[in-house]
C-alpha cells in the first residue's frame, strides 16, 4: 500500500511592508514552496518570488468583510502538509509577535505535522526604524513594552491595566490600538504619565504610504483623528519620540510617497521596482506589452544555426538576447556557437542579459541608442556581415547606417510585442481615473506605443493626469508623436538615469 510522504509547514515572517526586509531564509522558502497561505498585509512583491507552479491562497483578515476563521486556516495547513505538500504560511511582521503564530504551531504539533518558525522583522521594529523613533536610547529609555490595544476577545483592556502600565516602563508601543486611542491615552494620563510626554502614531510602517503624526500624549488622539489615521498603525509613547526630527530618514528619501507606474512585464520589472523602492517610492507594475514569438520562428532558428558566419551579432534588448538563446538551444547549440563572431550590446542592461548565457559583450555602446552603436561598429573596421536579432517592429536607423557603411546586415525578428489586455487594462484604467498614480515611466518606444494602443483614443487625456518620464530622447519623441506631454527626459539612458532625472524634476518644482 502506497503512503504519501508528509509535507512540512514553515511559518515565515513576511516583515512589515518593505519587501526588501524579508529574510534570506524566507525568500528561499518562498522560491521552493508548493503552496503559500498569505496574510492581507503581505506585500505582492513577495508573492512574485514564488515559483509559477506554486498555489497561492489569500487567507488574510480584512475589516468589514467576511474573513476566514483561524480554525479554518489551521485546518488548511494541516490538510495540505498531510497530503505531502510543502507549505509556507506567510505572516505579516514576525510570526511570534501578536501574529497567532504560536497557535498555529501548537495545532501543527498536536496534529503531528513537522513545522519550522522563521522569524521576520516585526511591524513594531520597522515602525520604530522607518519613522526615526528608536524604542530605546541610553539617555531617554532603557525599557520598552509591547502591548495590543485589545484582549483575546477583542475587548479593550481595563482602564486599571493601562494605568498600571503608565509609569511601569519608559517606552510604550501599542499595536492594533487605533480604535481605542482616546481611551488608552486618557488611562495612561490618569495612571500618572505626564500629558506632555511625546507620542506618535505610525501608519503603514515601512511602505511609501507611511504616515507619521506626533503630538503630546494629551493631544495625540485628536491629532491622529484629524490626520485620518487608522489601522494598521502603531502608537508610540515616550521621550524617544522627541528624536524623530533628527532621525527621520525614510520620509526624506527623494521620491518618498510617490507612486510610479512601470508598464513592463513583471519578470522584467523587478530590478526597476527595487530601484524605485530604494528612493522611497512605490512601484506599480502593470504589463502594457506582452512578449510573443516571432511570426517566423524558423528564420530565427536558421540565424542561430549560422551565427558563426557573422562578424558581429548585435543585441538591442534583453528580450532579443533571451529569445535568441532559446532558439540556439532549440537547434542544439550554446554559447560556443559564437566562436569567431563578436557580440555587441546597445547598453549595459542588454550586456548584463548576455552574462547568464555565458557571453560577455565585446562592445557596449557608450550612448545607448542604435545610431551610437552603428557609429562604433563602423569605427572598428573589417566588419562585413552583421546579424541583428530584435523585435518585429523596431527603429531602422541601426541597420540602415551599417548598410550605408558597406556592410551586409541581416535583421531577424526574435520576438513580437503586442498590447496586453484583460485585467491589465482594467487595473490601469482604474488607477488613472481615480488619480492613484503620480508618475509613468517609459523605458522604451515600444512601451509607449503599446500603452497608447491599450488605452485607445482617450490615451492622451488619461495620461495628462500623471507626470510622464522617458528614458531618453528617442522614447520621448515617440511619446510626443502620440501627443503626450513629456515632463522628464533622462540624460543617461538607464533606469537609474531616469530616476535621477525624476528626482531633479521634483527638486526644481519645490525650490
Which residue ranges define each predicted feature?
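Short, basic, glycine/proline-bearing loop/turn elements
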Residues: 5-16, 58-63, 145-150, 285-290, ...
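Short gly/pro/ser/thr-enriched loop/turn and capping motifs at secondary-structure boundaries
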Residues: 44-45, 63-65, 122-126, 143-146, ...
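Short, well-ordered beta-strand core segments
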Residues: 34-36, 56, 134, 172, ...
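Signature of uroporphyrinogen-III synthase
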Residues: 17, 69-73, 79-83, 207-511
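A glycine- and small-aliphatic-rich helix-loop capping segment at beta-alpha/alpha-beta transitions
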Residues: 27, 103-115, 131-138, 329-334, ...
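Short internal beta-strands
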Residues: 29-41, 198-203, 343-347, 467-472
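Class I S-adenosyl-L-methionine
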Residues: 1-19, 24-121, 126, 226, ...
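Beta-strand/loop-alpha-helix module characteristic of Rossmann-like adenine-cofactor folds
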Residues: 2-11, 82, 87, 106, ...
Amino acid at each position: 500500500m502506497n503512503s504519501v510522504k508528509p509535507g512540512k509547514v514553515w511559518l515565515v515572517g513576511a516583515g512589515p511592508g518593505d519587501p526588501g526586509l524579508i529574510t534570506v531564509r524566507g525568500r528561499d522558502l518562498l522560491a521552493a514552496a508548493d503552496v503559500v497561505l498569505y496574510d492581507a498585509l503581505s506585500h505582492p512583491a513577495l508573492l512574485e518570488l514564488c515559483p509559477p507552479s506554486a498555489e497561492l491562497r489569500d487567507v488574510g483578515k480584512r475589516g468589514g468583510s467576511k474573513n476566514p476563521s483561524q480554525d479554518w486556516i489551521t485546518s488548511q495547513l494541516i490538510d495540505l502538509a498531510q497530503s505531502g505538500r510543502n507549505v509556507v504560511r506567510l505572516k505579516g511582521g514576525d510570526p511570534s509577535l501578536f501574529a497567532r503564530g504560536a497557535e498555529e504551531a501548537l495545532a501543527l504539533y498536536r496534529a503531528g505535522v513537522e513545522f519550522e518558525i522563521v522569524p521576520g522583522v516585526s511591524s513594531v521594529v520597522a515602525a520604530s526604524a522607518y519613522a526615526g523613533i528608536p524604542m530605546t536610547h541610553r539617555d531617554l529609555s532603557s525599557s520598552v513594552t509591547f502591548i495590543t490595544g485589545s484582549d483575546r476577545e477583542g475587548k479593550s483592556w481595563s482602564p486599571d491595566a493601562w494605568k498600571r502600565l503608565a509609569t511601569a516602563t519608559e517606552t510604550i508601543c501599542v499595536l492594533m490600538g487605533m480604535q481605542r486611542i482616546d481611551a488608552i491615552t486618557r488611562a495612561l494620563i490618569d495612571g500618572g504619565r505626564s500629558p506632555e510626554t511625546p507620542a506618535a502614531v505610525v501608519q503603514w510602517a515601512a511602505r511609501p504610504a507611511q504616515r507619521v503624526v506626533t503630538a503630546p500624549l494629551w493631544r495625540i488622539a485628536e491629532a491622529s483623528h484629524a490626520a485620518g489615521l487608522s489601522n494598521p498603525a502603531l502608537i508610540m509613547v515616550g521621550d524617544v519620540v522627541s528624536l524623530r526630527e533628527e532621525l527621520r530618514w525614510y520620509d526624506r528619501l527623494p521620491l518618498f510617497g510617490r507612486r510610479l507606474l512601470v508598464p513592463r512585464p513583471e519578470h522584467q520589472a523587478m530590478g526597476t521596482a527595487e530601484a524605485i523602492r530604494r528612493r522611497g517610492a512605490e512601484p506599480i507594475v502593470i504589463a502594457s506589452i506582452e512578449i510573443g514569438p516571432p511570426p517566423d520562428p524558423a528564420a530565427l532558428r536558421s540565424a542561430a544555426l549560422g551565427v558563426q558566419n557573422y562578424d558581429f551579432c548585435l543585441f538591442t534588448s534583453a528580450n532579443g538576447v533571451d529569445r535568441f538563446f532559446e532558439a540556439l538551444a532549440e537547434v542544439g547549440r550554446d554559447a560556443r556557437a559564437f566562436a569567431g563572431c563578436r557580440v555587441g550590446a546597445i547598453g549595459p542592461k542588454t550586456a548584463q542579459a548576455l552574462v547568464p548565457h555565458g557571453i560577455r559583450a565585446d562592445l557596449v555602446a557608450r550612448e545607448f541608442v542604435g545610431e551610437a552603436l552603428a557609429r562604433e561598429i563602423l569605427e572598428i573596421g573589417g566588419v562585413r556581415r552583421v546579424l541583428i536579432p530584435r523585435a518585429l517592429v523596431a527603429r531602422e536607423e541601426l541597420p540602415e547606417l551599417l548598410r550605408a557603411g558597406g556592410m551586409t546586415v541581416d535583421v531577424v525578428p526574435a520576438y513580437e510585442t503586442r498590447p496586453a489586455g484583460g485585467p491589465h487594462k482594467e487595473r490601469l484604467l482604474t488607477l488613472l481615473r481615480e488619480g492613484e498614480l503620480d508618475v509613468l515611466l517609459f523605458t522604451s518606444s515600444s512601451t509607449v506605443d503599446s500603452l497608447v494602443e491599450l488605452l485607445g483614443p482617450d490615451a492622451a487625456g488619461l495620461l495628462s493626469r500623471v507626470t510622464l518620464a522617458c528614458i531618453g530622447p528617442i522614447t520621448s519623441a515617440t511619446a510626443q508623436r502620440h501627443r503626450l506631454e513629456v515632463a522628464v527626459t533622462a540624460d543617461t539612458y538607464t533606469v537609474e538615469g531616469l530616476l535621477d532625472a525624476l528626482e531633479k524634476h521634483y527638486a526644481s518644482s519645490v525650490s
